[in-house]
């Protein structure tokens, strides 16, 4: 999982093991921790053997036989189950081209179950947070999420979530993509994939839940009360169209007046 990759900022195939408010032993079949906003879980230990076999097949060539890292891929020991789940479920890993500056989102090569199995194996090497999140969106405040998004996310992903170019040939991916799930949004915020900031201590679980609700709600399913969203790229396109119509209208009026005189 290349360190220079910019990931965007994914709910797929995760079973809820409970809503424990405090951390329990990591890696166990019922290990959970979290809050009323987000519960973090770990795949059961029974997944580890299958996960190890998958890791050797799809991951070890870049990350090493024991996930210790190589010149082709970073050390994965201690990254947490949530990190592994994000990269695999978004299709960024296994990488088709390890030399790419940025691994793009693509259809996942491994199933959600297989992602959990690999996450269980990697987490067993050095149990760590974050776990795999279950987001309780029914309690979210979408208005607060919109404000938090504008303060913490819009600088890279733009205020409309359409994504934008960054330095060194990388980009912040679009969050308008309906394939981006609430689970992946939380995982990205909590793990900071590639050079995305890790908001582990800056945002509470409730704030992350609110941002997630906004992204998977209004950004991915806009109401467009104006009728036409002009590609959803924000006020620049809207201003340009308004200017074009306004100037064009004035030109026609001026031509009409001049023709009459």
Feature annotation, model-predicted:
Residues 77-126, 169-223:
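Extracytoplasmic electron-transfer domains, predominantly the class I c-type cytochrome c fold
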Residues 44-48, 52-75, 86, 90-96, ...:
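Periplasmic/extracellular electron-transfer cofactor-ligation site
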Residues 1-3, 20-57, 68-71, 79-83, ...:
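Short sequence/structural segments immediately N-terminal
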């Amino acid at each position: 999982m290349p360190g220079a990759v910019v990931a965007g900022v994914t709910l797929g195939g995760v079973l809820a093991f409970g809503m424990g408010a405090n951390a329990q032993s990591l890696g166990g079949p019922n290990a959970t921790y979290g809050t009323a906003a987000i519960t973090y879980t770990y795949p059961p230990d029974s997944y580890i053997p299958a996960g190890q076999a998958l890791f050797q097949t799809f991951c070890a060539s870049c990350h090493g036989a024991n996930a210790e890292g190589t010149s082709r891929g970073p050390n994965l020991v201690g990254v947490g189950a949530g990190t592994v789940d994000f990269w695999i479920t978004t299709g960024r890993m296994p990488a088709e081209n390890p030399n790419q500056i940025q691994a793009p989102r693509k259809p996942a090569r491994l199933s959600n179950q297989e992602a959990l199995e690999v996450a269980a194996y990697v987490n067993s090497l050095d149990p760590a947070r974050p776990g795999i999140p279950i987001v309780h969106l029914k309690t979210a405040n979408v208005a607060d999420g919109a404000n938090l998004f504008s303060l913490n996310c819009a600088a890279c992903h733009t205020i409309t979530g359409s994504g934008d170019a960054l330095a060194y040939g990388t980009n912040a991916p679009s969050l308008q993509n309906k394939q981006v799930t609430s689970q992946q949004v939380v995982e990205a915020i909590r793990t900071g994939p590639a050079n995305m900031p890790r908001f582990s201590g800056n945002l509470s679980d409730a704030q992350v839940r609110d941002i997630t609700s906004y992204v998977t709600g209004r950004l991915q399913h806009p109401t467009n009360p104006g009728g036409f969203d002009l590609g959803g790229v924000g006020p620049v396109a809207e201003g340009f169209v308004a200017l074009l119509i306004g100037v064009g209208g004035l030109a026609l009026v001026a031509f009409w007046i001049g023709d009459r005189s």
